[in-house]
Swiss-Prot record:
Alphabetic keyword roster: Apicoplast, DNA-directed RNA polymerase, Nucleotidyltransferase, Plastid, Transcription, Transferase
Protein name: DNA-directed RNA polymerase subunit beta
Native source species: Theileria parva (East coast fever infection agent)
Family that this chain belongs to: Belongs to the RNA polymerase beta chain family.
Role noted for this protein: DNA-dependent RNA polymerase catalyzes the transcription of DNA into RNA using the four ribonucleoside triphosphates as substrates.
Length: 1005
């Protein structure tokens, strides 16, 4: 591996802007200046403007946070100022040189992420139509203009006017002969591009025949058109229109990938350049220079925030684990770029559907829920981005020796095999005669012997990495497979993770994760290795220190800890991996543990996918994770009004608030911090009261002496559910004050930042959510001692117990196959590489399991001893259990939805005075709304008093929102209870007597 992968990303990023700035300055900007030359004469300001591109400079903004600290404050934006010298010749003055700020670009790290407002953001790819047309009337004739994107900022313009066609590339007209460069070309290279050769030969035939075709609703001579072009890419684009109208070779839908091109956020950032580098902005800038006005970089800063901070194609980087980080790199926006701030935009259903040409390039399974369903997906693992085109890698051609590359256009021209498999039945191998192929945008069954296809579509070409690591994926419902792939990205890294007994061939580390590892920058020998530092001595006897930083707190308070994989005395080369993240073990994805699971029943606690776990999981710290809470406090200063200071002694003493303040004024207690404990307290020292004149008069009447006003602010305390240990606090001072107000940057600033790190150990608890790799998830309902669990005749107790009904009801059979193979691996101390699709290798699953068993050299009676149908005994009586029992060994993960962060309790009270509803929010110790499922949960736990409180009218939100009441009809909870009683043939009605003479009014629920 090469250690300069991160540097290559950085160089490509900088070179993109440098090249595009040069092209724009040499073509577009100069043409704009010449176009507005008459305007300069009228204004009598400019005479000439000259750009010095060779003196282009990059100026970095001030980094007010530590470069080694991974946790940044919420206002941190790191970017470059790109400046270019301008020589401006005025009419009445001498020439002057100015350093003009043309664009601001964000900084990127070695992983390709940018930092915006203190969080790492990930720019994703998005699709856009490569061809757009505009029609207008000029001199009573219709003129059509077609804009076709070729490369980054290079566009092809085709103008159709009065049976004439004119082709431009940006602003240059094409008039050269096209086929002069192809007369003596012999196509002997076996790595050729199918689409280009097909286009050249096809248009050559058109030239020889000298036929007129009806293109763009106009009759154009092909011979004349060919003589006026010179680029093969242009010829391919024109041939695409010919095929659409004549051959019907491609799909005419605009949603097809043929008509789209992939774009990145670089194009969005470069839009600032076209808006900022205009002659009017330069004139305003020079006007401020002439009249000595104060110049701010506010315009480019506003453009920077407008294009990046609220950009829909820049997402937050999810770094909860390695898989979540990796899947974000494959994101793609199929809908395209939109400036709309409304999330509930309306998109046609045809765009949300899976297109036929997505197969092999875009993952057809993975998509988010909600409004963006079908609009945001992930690229398949084989898809690469080559010159802003999606190309396929893994395609085998029978005429070539090696694998070749084909693009989207060639894919639609040839047949493609979708499931080329071999079945094994009765120990005999035979080939399938009929096979399903993808031809002419349809799936057809053809004879395999007559129609030989030369391209195979593998599973690797259609799924992403989170689906490929799931064994027996195709033995499940597709919805459960999608749920399992998403839950891999929500799994918490554990302290003690394990290798799965059942794995796939895609479970190894991907090449994209190379930037997440700590690599060597030189050749040398390892001198020292420990948990926080690796020392390497190079060939010149220099010592290089690589710090591992055991706990790097990242976005969303997640962290990454590194573990060294080298030893003392080992010789290393450049690019050698020295340390891996904690969720990678031996270069494999290890996010969970092997769970000895018993599919059985346990006094009803396993109902509705609930899980009963063994208490030994807590004692041995299995399924234990670590999390951080970071609290920040800013001390600001206003030169005219106030200054904020820390307070050493508290103004009010509260015996419930434990505190120990040091000489700095912050908490120095290293003990366990509870809810409500004070971390720091600050006061606002008012310097002047001249703004509020009325308050100033009252203050002078009360205090006749010259006294200053001190305002006591709310202290920084531990939030509910954030109990932990204070392991570190930072005091960050800035040599340059951090700006708080954009209008007055020199007055209102922050001069100090206090940051507290609370360390939490999250052990498994009741209410935590566990899941398997097949979408089977459940909540921990009870923690049982080891002596209260059933056991085998060898004294083995399961780690957890769950119900087998949910798996069969959801057609989730892959977990049984995985658990059976994992149980064999536990007993025989081996690991099994399982296929994703069982039917690719064997016809029956039972035969596959028997083949695994027969491959192990054991006695015949071992099958009975190690059978998955264990004979469990009751822990009370010791007799054999008669109900259904099944012992499996699946791989389980711990999800991020922990009970400590979700549970919220309160006493009766704290109702709103207006609506008489419970207050909302954790800060005010509020509660949540109760729905129908919550009422069912209270009924199952026998919470009669809580249900009685919910049955009152004050719990009905809709009743209090409507002020026109037409009689009391009861709360919604009371209606749910009466409907459930009707299911058991108990009818409850309420009768109201308004008067002796009136009839009775009956309310039926």
């Amino acid at each position: 591996m090469n250690c300069t992968v991160g540097n290559n990303i950085y160089h490509t990023y900088i070179n993109y802007f440098v090249n595009n700035i040069y092209n724009s300055l040499s073509r577009n900007i100069n043409s704009k200046i010449n176009k507005y030359y008459n305007y300069y004469k009228k204004s009598k300001i400019f005479k000439n403007i000259k750009f010095y591109f060779n003196l282009l400079t990059f100026e970095s903004n001030y980094c007010c946070d530590s470069g080694q600290n991974k946790y940044l404050y919420d206002g941190y934006n790191s970017y470059y100022f790109i400046n270019i010298p301008l020589q401006i010749k005025f009419n009445n003055l001498k020439s002057r040189f100015i350093n003009y700020n043309i664009i601001n670009i964000p900084k990127i790290n070695q992983s390709g992420d940018i930092i915006l407002n203190g969080y790492l953001r990930l720019p994703i790819l998005y699709l856009q139509l490569a061809t757009n047309n505009i029609s207008y009337i000029f001199n009573e004739k219709i003129t059509r203009t077609y804009f076709i994107k070729i490369k980054n900022n290079i566009y092809l313009y085709i103008y159709l006017y009065d049976d004439f066609i004119t082709v431009y590339i940006n602003s240059y007209k094409i008039k050269n002969d096209l086929f002069s460069m192809y007369n003596n070309v012999s196509f002997k290279n076996k790595y050729i591009n199918f689409s280009k050769i097909d286009n050249v030969i096809y248009v050559m035939n058109l030239k020889n025949n000298n036929i007129k075709y009806h293109i763009f609703d106009k009759t154009i001579n092909i011979n004349n058109f060919v003589n006026n072009t010179m680029f093969m890419d242009i010829l391919s684009i024109v041939n695409k229109f010919l095929n659409l109208n004549l051959k019907k070779k491609f799909i005419q839908s605009s949603n097809n990938l043929i008509n789209k091109s992939t774009n990145s956020v670089l194009k969005t950032i470069f839009r600032q350049f076209t808006k900022s580098v205009t002659i009017f902005d330069i004139e305003k800038y020079c006007d401020k220079l002439l009249y000595k006005k104060k110049i701010f970089r506010s315009f480019n800063i506003v453009l920077f925030k407008e294009h990046l901070l609220v950009n829909p194609v820049i997402h937050y980087t999810d770094q909860l684990n390695v898989l979540s980080y990796l899947t974000n790199k494959f994101k793609i926006n199929i809908f395209g770029y939109s400036n709309s701030s409304n999330d509930k935009f309306k998109v046609s259903t045809n765009l949300r559907k899976i297109q036929s040409d997505y197969i092999g390039f875009i993952n057809i399974v993975n998509t988010p829920d909600g409004d963006t369903c079908g609009l945001i997906s992930k690229l398949a693992n084989n898809t690469i981005l080559d010159k802003f085109k999606l190309k396929l890698i893994n395609c085998n051609n029978e005429y070539f020796e090696n694998f070749t590359k084909i693009d989207i256009t060639s894919k639609n021209l040839y047949n493609m095999t979708s499931n080329n498999f071999i079945n094994i039945k009765k120990n005999s191998t035979f080939k399938v005669k009929q096979i399903e192929v993808f031809k002419n945008n349809e799936f057809k069954l053809i004879n395999f012997d007559k129609n030989k296809t030369n391209k195979n579509l593998n599973v690797f070409n259609t799924l992403s990495i989170t689906e490929l690591i799931i064994p027996f994926l195709f033995n499940n419902d597709p919805c459960r497979g999608l749920m399992g792939s998403k839950m891999h990205t929500q799994a918490l890294p554990l302290i003690y993770n394990e290798h799965p007994y059942v794995m796939t061939k895609y479970n190894h580390m991907n090449g994209l994760l190379f930037n997440k590892c700590i690599t060597s920058l030189c050749e040398g020998i390892i001198v020292s290795v420990n948990n926080y530092k690796i020392i390497v001595m190079d060939d010149k006897n220099r010592y290089l220190h690589y710090y591992l930083y055991p706990f790097n707190v990242l976005d969303y308070n997640s962290f990454v800890s590194y573990k060294p994989i080298v030893w003392v005395g080992e010789k290393i080369n450049i690019g050698k991996i020295l340390a891996l993240p904690s969720d990678l073990k031996h270069s494999e994805f290890t996010l969970g543990v092997n769970n000895l699971l018993n599919y059985s029943f346990y006094n009803g606690y396993e109902h509705e996918d609930a899980i009963v776990i063994n208490k030994n999981l807590i004692i041995e710290d299995i399924l234990t994770s670590i999390s951080f809470d970071v609290y920040e406090e800013y001390l600001s200063i206003n030169k005219l009004d106030y200054v904020e200071l820390t307070l050493r002694h508290l103004l009010e003493y509260n015996r419930y608030n434990r505190y120990l303040i040091n000489e700095v004024g912050v908490s120095s207690n290293q003990d366990y911090m509870l809810f409500g404990d004070i971390l720091s307290t600050k006061i606002r020292y008012e310097l002047s009261l001249s703004k509020n004149k009325k308050f100033f008069k009252v203050f002078k009447l009360i205090f006749k002496e010259n006294k200053k006003l001190i305002v006591y602010t709310k202290p920084l305390t531990i939030k509910r559910g954030g109990e932990g240990r204070l392991i570190k606090y930072e005091i960050l001072g800035y040599s340059k004050f951090r700006q708080l107000d954009a209008m007055y940057p020199e007055i209102n600033v922050s001069y100090l930042t206090l940051r507290f790190f609370i360390f939490k150990i999250d052990r498994i608890n009741i209410g935590d959510k566990l899941c398997g790799r097949h979408g089977n998830k459940g909540v921990v309902s009870k923690i049982v001692d080891n002596i209260d669990l059933p056991y085998t005749f060898r004294g083995l107790c399961p780690y957890s117990i769950t119900s087998p009904i949910g798996a069969l009801a959801r057609i989730n059979l892959g977990q049984f196959l995985e658990g059976s193979c994992g149980y064999f691996g536990l007993n025989f101390n081996c690991r099994i590489k399982a296929p994703i699709n069982l039917y690719n290798y064997h016809l029956y699953s039972n035969m596959y399991l028997k083949n695994i068993f027969n491959s192990l050299n054991v006695y015949n009676n071992s099958y009975i001893n190690f059978s998955i149908e264990k004979y469990l005994r009751d822990f009370k009586t010791g007799y054999q259990l008669k109900n259904f029992n099944l012992m499996l060994m699946p791989y389980f993960l711990k999800l991020m939805h922990t009970s400590k962060s979700k549970f919220q309790y309160r006493t009766v009270g704290k109702y709103s005075s207006l609506t008489q509803q419970p207050v909302k929010g954790k800060r005010v110790n509020g509660s949540q709304k109760f729905g129908e499922m919550e009422v069912w949960a209270l009924e199952s736990h026998g919470s009669a008093y809580t249900i009685r409180e919910l049955g009152y009218i004050k719990t009905n939100v809709k009743y209090f929102k409507k002020f026109e009441h037409k009689g009391y009809k009861g709360s919604e909870t009371f209606k749910v209870l009466t409907l459930e009683l009707k299911n058991v043939l108990i009818n409850i009605n309420r009768v109201d007597n308004y008067s002796y003479f009136n009839q009775k009014i009956k309310y039926n629920y």
